[in-house]
Amino acid sequence: MKKTIISHFYNEEYLLPWWLMHHTKIFDHGILINRGSTDRSVEICKLLAPHWEVRNSRFLEFDPTNTDIEVMEIEREVSGWKIVLNTTEFFCCNNTEEFFSSLHTLGQNMYAIRMILMIDNHNYNYNYSKPRYSIPLVEQRYHGVFPYNPNLGCAWRFIHNHLDGAYLPGRHHSRHGYIIYDYPSFILKFYFSPWNEQSKARKLQITPTLSKRGVQMGLQTHYGQSPEVLDIRFSELSNLTQDLRHNPEYQKLFPKFKP
């Protein structure tokens, strides 16, 4: 069964090289939706994933409802297993063939893949080297918040083989029935990681593109309105982050990271 990943992007030239090099090894096909990028994002997509599609979004403002409508329209064009991820989100499993085989074995049409929020530890950052494109990003950071109870906050993304995902805005809920995929397979969401000037600039550029509805939903507080506000938020979240190398499920996913 065909495996397709779909993703919107806007000025993602910092994370896209890692994201594309990671996911082109897992998925047969990718549909990348450009929301008016003015940097090298499109060029990077064509360079690192020349066999994937790059399309222009018909929505230049960032609006969660319109984004999900557009995504579901595209999902209806393809068959097989489908997943929709943001550029911050990296799907990880031990063995791709075994993972997709297990989806058939379990007999469901939709699965929730648990999400780990990657957040650097401000007391540990001096031990991290500057991120390099020659090494997978998922192998360069190992601090985050593990979804011990993923039902709190719906800490997951969906993979499914329905006509479309029947998502509610934000894509953490679906009108389809689904089960949580419990084997060591996760979405690593680089939320406040790697925490550097490039990541700050990436977050701050999104706020001015929010639609009126996005502002009413309070998304400007999610992406930040100044570097100072982001640094305060990072300090708060950094106190919650854990060294994932001590987590047994994470160890199964990344055995090289055992402390």
Annotated model-derived regions:
Residues 64-73, 92-259:
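Catalytic-site signature of metal-activated, phosphate-bearing donor transferases
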Residues 28, 80, 88, 109:
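Conserved acidic residues
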Residues 18, 40-85:
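Active-site-proximal specificity loops/subdomain of glycosyltransferases
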Residues 4-6, 30-31, 53:
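A structural signal for isolated positions on well-ordered beta-strands in alpha/beta enzyme cores
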Residues 35, 85-87:
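Active-site acidic Asp-centered loop
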Residues 28-36, 57:
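Short beta-strand/loop segment that forms part of the nucleotide-sugar
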Residues 24:
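Gly/Ala-rich phosphate-binding loop of Rossmann-like dinucleotide-binding domains
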